[in-house]
Amino acid sequence: HSQGTFTSDYSKYLDSRRAQDFVQWLMNT
């Protein structure tokens, strides 16, 4: 179960990183 929790938390982390990168890309365009 801890593995599944880690995976979901990690995917949330990646989503937040992707969102930040997207915002940076928009501001730089």
Curated annotation (Swiss-Prot):
GO cellular component entries: extracellular space
Subcellular location: Secreted
InterPro entries (UniProt xref): Glucagon, Glucagon_GIP_secretin_VIP
Pfam families for this protein: Hormone_2 (PF00123)
Keyword Cytoplasm: no
The entry's keywords: Hormone, Phosphoprotein, Secreted
Molecular function GO terms recorded: glucagon receptor binding; hormone activity
One GO BP annotation of this record: negative regulation of apoptotic process
Induction: Produced in the A cells of the islets of Langerhans in response to a drop in blood sugar concentration.
Domain of life: Eukaryota
Sequence positions bearing Phosphoserine: 2
Family: Belongs to the glucagon family.
Role noted for this protein: Glucagon plays a key role in glucose metabolism and homeostasis. Regulates blood glucose by increasing gluconeogenesis and decreasing glycolysis.
Official protein name in the record: Glucagon
Organism lineage: Eukaryota, Metazoa, Chordata, Craniata, Vertebrata
